[in-house]
Amino acid sequence: MLDIRYMRKNSAEVKQRLEYRGVNPETIDELLELDQKRRDLIQKVESLKAQRNDVSDKIAFAKRQKEDASEAILQMKQVGADIKSLDNEQTLLDEQVREIAAHLPNMAAFDVPVGPDESANVEQRKWAPEEYGSRPHALEEASWVKAHYEIGENLGILDFERGAKVSGARFLYYVGDGARLERAVYNFMLDEHRQEGYTEMITPIVVNDSAMFGTGQYPKFQDDAYRVEGLNQTYIPTAEVPLTNYYSGEELPSEDLPIKFTALSPSFRKEAGSAGKDTRGLIRLHQFNKVEMVKFTKPEDSYEELEKMTLDAENILQKLNLPYHVIVLSTGDMGFSAAKTYDIEVWMPQQNVYREISSVSNTEDFQARRMHITYRDADNKLQLVHTLNGSGLAVGRTVAAILENYQNEDGSVTIPEVLRPYLAGQEKLEPTTHH
């Protein structure tokens, strides 16, 4: 949620910055007009309440003097009726203001590239392991290079057919070494983040609608969520929701900041509007595992912490020796709550393209305002914290990248060295028979 006081004082700037995010400036005019009406009403109500107090005093005085107070009593009733009418009007205005404000995205940080969509994203850096060039398919696409889902099916470790039979499209079973590889990947990720000072959590996977509102998924993205029928609850689209809401409504001790959490969770997404995209494989599923990172920071530290969190995600890819690049998203491609976002995209040799594997964002105080998460600054004034979140990483997409980047011509897949301790020293995935 944006700061309405800032919007009042800086309406021209806010209109310009939100126009970069796709918001019609007239929407801001409408919001500020309703806000002004609401404030005028509040003043009227306060004035009437003062008048009511005066009349009440007059009635009490008249009664003490045994004088006729009927006129004052009538006046009192009229003032009471006027207050009630204005209160109802104010409630309606409050709802209208809230409804518009709840649909406004965050303003982008000033250094974010301005543009309508992903075409305006800017590459920050790219990385590939030195030995990557010696992999046979790294420099030119070898004829035997297969897509991760073909490799997984040939090895008997990914079963999309039975996933579809039991649950529908975009679901799968990990089988045998596939399940072990997925587990190895997320345990490795969690261990790395723990070493970087993140507290590991296991969170609920069903949250209240208020939690979805707090992180900015609701009200705008309800169509993409799996709702629990008959309850105001939702299956989480990311562990960002329960992790960030952990402190909703709380004041955090200043000396504890930054606070860093990490969690593995299943994520559930309807993928509304993705018909025809990535219909095969692990890239776009309705249910997938993801390791999430979340931070609560002081405002002056949040951008330094954003850079650190991005490096924490990159660290995983570097230790897995997977090539990637980092891009900063433009104003037209950023998520609803973000003020600045880095996407990390991993190299997928069969598609000959980089694919998103992590998104790391600073939401500044946008989420904290919705959730009322505060701390006291050096002057002992209550301030909103800044919240950050990032994937560290999407587990299925990491498995997909490993299968494609570590595949061998004989159909086997070499297991990255850092994962071998999690797989009892196993060095390769080879075809197995299962029914």
From Swiss-Prot:
The protein's annotated pathway: Aminoacyl-tRNA biosynthesis; selenocysteinyl-tRNA(Sec) biosynthesis; L-seryl-tRNA(Sec) from L-serine and tRNA(Sec): step 1/1
Top-level taxon of the source organism: Bacteria
CDD domains (alphabetical): SerRS_core
Catalytic activity: tRNA(Ser) + L-serine + ATP = L-seryl-tRNA(Ser) + AMP + diphosphate + H(+); tRNA(Sec) + L-serine + ATP = L-seryl-tRNA(Sec) + AMP + diphosphate + H(+)
Domain notes: Consists of two distinct domains, a catalytic core and a N-terminal extension that is involved in tRNA binding.
Function: Catalyzes the attachment of serine to tRNA(Ser). Is also able to aminoacylate tRNA(Sec) with serine, to form the misacylated tRNA L-seryl-tRNA(Sec), which will be further converted into selenocysteinyl-tRNA(Sec).
Keyword line: Aminoacyl-tRNA synthetase, ATP-binding, Cytoplasm, Ligase, Nucleotide-binding, Protein biosynthesis
GO biological process: selenocysteine biosynthetic process; seryl-tRNA aminoacylation
EC number: 6.1.1.11
Name recorded for this polypeptide: Serine--tRNA ligase
Location relative to the cell: Cytoplasm
Primary location group: cytoplasm
Subunit annotation: Homodimer. The tRNA molecule binds across the dimer.
Binding site for L-serine: T238, A239, E240, E292, S391
InterPro entries (UniProt xref): aa-tRNA-synt_IIb, aa-tRNA-synth_II, aa-tRNA-synth_II/BPL/LPL, Ser-tRNA-ligase_type_1, Ser-tRNA-synth_1_N, SerRS_1_N_sf, SerRS_core, tRNA-bd_arm
Family classification: Belongs to the class-II aminoacyl-tRNA synthetase family. Type-1 seryl-tRNA synthetase subfamily.
GO molecular function, one term: serine-tRNA ligase activity
Species: Leuconostoc mesenteroides subsp. mesenteroides (strain ATCC 8293 / DSM 20343 / BCRC 11652 / CCM 1803 / JCM 6124 / NCDO 523 / NBRC 100496 / NCIMB 8023 / NCTC 12954 / NRRL B-1118 / 37Y)
EC supergroup of this enzyme: ligase
One GO CC term, this protein: cytoplasm
Pfam families the record matches: Seryl_tRNA_N (PF02403), tRNA-synt_2b (PF00587)
Binding site for ATP: R269, K270, E271, E356, I357, S358, S359
